[in-house]
A protein has these predicted regions:
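Extracellular LysM carbohydrate-binding repeats and other cell-envelope/extracellular binding modules
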Residues: 69, 73-87, 116-147
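Primarily a LysM-type cell-wall glycan-binding module
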Residues: 48-52, 57, 86-113, 147
Length: 147
């Protein structure tokens, strides 16, 4: 499906150790499964600082969430997705910059006056986001289409 870039030094630290070393495949798989997305049959491999995810998922939403759950991990700079989902589309991702908030991101993607749609972005990134105000520079978010 493609290779997606992430910021290696930004993200959630998992496993033991420190710095921005890539986590093990087992640690990444455990992190992915902890979100209870329905990714039990997804395989995770590591090649340097690139994570490779392979398998079938139930829908586009899970596919995109799996990519960002793995990519928003400290030490991962790229995610190669070999995931498949019914009626698959190219995902839209956004890398958070300093000074961003979900309202501002919503207006940038959906148009002026659509900042109140920030909740659509928040809901699309749960359970990786726990609160609309808890985003950080370098974090990658999925931007769903508006219905």
């Amino acid at each position: 499906m493609g290779i997606f870039d992430f910021i290696k030094s930004a993200g959630k630290a998992i496993g033991i150790g420190g710095g921005d070393e890539a986590p093990t495949a087992d640690a990444l798989k455990k992190e992915l499964d902890s979100h209870k997305l329905g990714t039990e049959n997804v395989k995770v491999e590591i090649n340097g600082d690139k994570a490779i995810v392979t398998g079938d998922v139930a829908d586009q939403s899970i596919l995109e969430k799996a990519i960002i759950a793995v990519g928003n991990t400290l030490g991962v700079s790229k995610v190669e997705s070999n995931l498949t989902a019914p009626s698959q589309k190219d995902p839209v991702f956004y890398t958070v910059k300093k000074g961003d908030n979900l309202w501002k991101i919503s207006e940038a993607h959906y148009g002026k006056g659509k900042g109140a749609k920030y909740n659509v972005i928040f809901e699309a990134n749960k359970p990786m986001l726990s609160h609309p105000d808890k985003i950080y520079p370098g974090q990658v978010l999925r931007i769903p289409e508006l219905d």
